[in-house]
């Protein structure tokens, strides 16, 4: 009897535990559920950069498209689109297209540093813009409205704690006496600055995460 119990316990311990995740294979987005089963969500062969929403129900990703390269203050970028799809592969929706307007505050050249708000409703991203920094935008996934927020080369959403849903933004700034520096700053989602964080976000995350 004891031997049987030991065998049963060993069998229970040996059962692998999986978390939901997303990946890319041959240019297609894949979703792996909690049981470890992987399903292809797209079939274009041109998709990359998937990010899973906090509720585990939606995925955003970037799709390559044909078209003229988009000029920015730092480089030329091949056109892409930002899409979302449910984890069951249904309701694939185009959210934002790249656009060349000649102005950093309105032009969108790429979709980097994709970050969901904790509600999963908003998606923040960074696009190349000026010579020394990018531009941070946000799109509402429920109505596809997109707007420019502020300059920045990286953006992170604070997922918990006192500053939940605030943003950590890497910005290029200048010293009064000359020279420049790149620091992360804590800002509200409406753009109001809270204060400096530093060259990295490690200390902030260690102090202000639940």
Name every feature range the model reports, one short phrase each.
Residues 4-13:
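Sec-dependent N-terminal signal peptides
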Residues 17-210:
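Sequence signature of WD/YWTD-type beta-propeller architectures
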